[in-house]
């Protein structure tokens, strides 16, 4: 039995030393120290020994078990340390490499178009006027010659908050508020009103329940239709190119009389007819007209002394036409791949 223990110890220590991974080491633990291992078998044979041999062989067996346990524990620590070092080596971050830079936003295409128009009108002596987006029914409709139950209200399905308040459907209420408080001793009214508006439209490629408008208003003495036409001509040439021609078509808006819609000669085909202009050679841009006398009177302005014109257009439509954007939803999805295409846009050609 003595020789058996010595052979077992030598063989086990050699295999433990050569173990290359934790699984192999655990298998050796089970092989030599497990319930079915040789050490267990040796301990069972102790009962066959004489009374003199039992203490000696029992002590030796315990020494072998302790030595093997110590060898396995030591080897386990070595293998665990090596495994940790390998993992750290594999997961090491090279801090000298450049990091992944976060995506940086740019000035939105709509913002650029709005600012371009604002700069143009400011250069013509206009001021920028703003008003609440949650508006009174009176300013959104009644002050603009749209009394309650007027059939023209059906043209603008609205988001009502209470019976008398709603999300504005146009920036025209800003014009009504401006006219109410204006002092003509300081000169005529010349304002543009940019801002968000809301209508109950189903979102699709050309419609959105929220969009932006820029409306213009000029009121003073001796303001004529010729002034309106000249202003719209400057707008068309500034935004779409000096070679643009304009066409005014009779239309109807409750707050202007007479009312016209402005078309520009197609910047894509030069008026020959193409997909953009639907073969007509003209593209509809905005609505406009001379301020209705009723609107002036409701704002406390003497319509026999003062006259004016107003116009309104959507920056989204301008942006889509000018930069060939085929879906209005692209302007609102915050996709940097889209917005970064326009970080260097300039006035003029597409």
Curated annotation (Swiss-Prot):
Keywords: Aminoacyl-tRNA synthetase, ATP-binding, Cytoplasm, Ligase, Magnesium, Metal-binding, Nucleotide-binding, Protein biosynthesis. GO terms for biological process: phenylalanyl-tRNA aminoacylation. The keyword Repeat does not apply. GO terms for cellular component: cytoplasm. It catalyses: tRNA(Phe) + L-phenylalanine + ATP = L-phenylalanyl-tRNA(Phe) + AMP + diphosphate + H(+). The keyword Phosphoprotein does not apply. CDD domains: PheRS_alpha_core. Its EC number is 6.1.1.20. Gene3D superfamilies: Bira Bifunctional Protein, Domain 2 (3.30.930.10). Its cofactor is Mg(2+). Mg(2+) binds at residue 257. PROSITE patterns: AA_TRNA_LIGASE_II. Tetramer of two alpha and two beta subunits. Belongs to the class-II aminoacyl-tRNA synthetase family. Phe-tRNA synthetase alpha subunit type 1 subfamily. This is Phenylalanine--tRNA ligase alpha subunit. It comes from Listeria welshimeri serovar 6b (strain ATCC 35897 / DSM 20650 / CCUG 15529 / CIP 8149 / NCTC 11857 / SLCC 5334 / V8). The lineage of its organism: Bacteria, Bacillati, Bacillota, Bacilli, Bacillales. The gene is pheS.
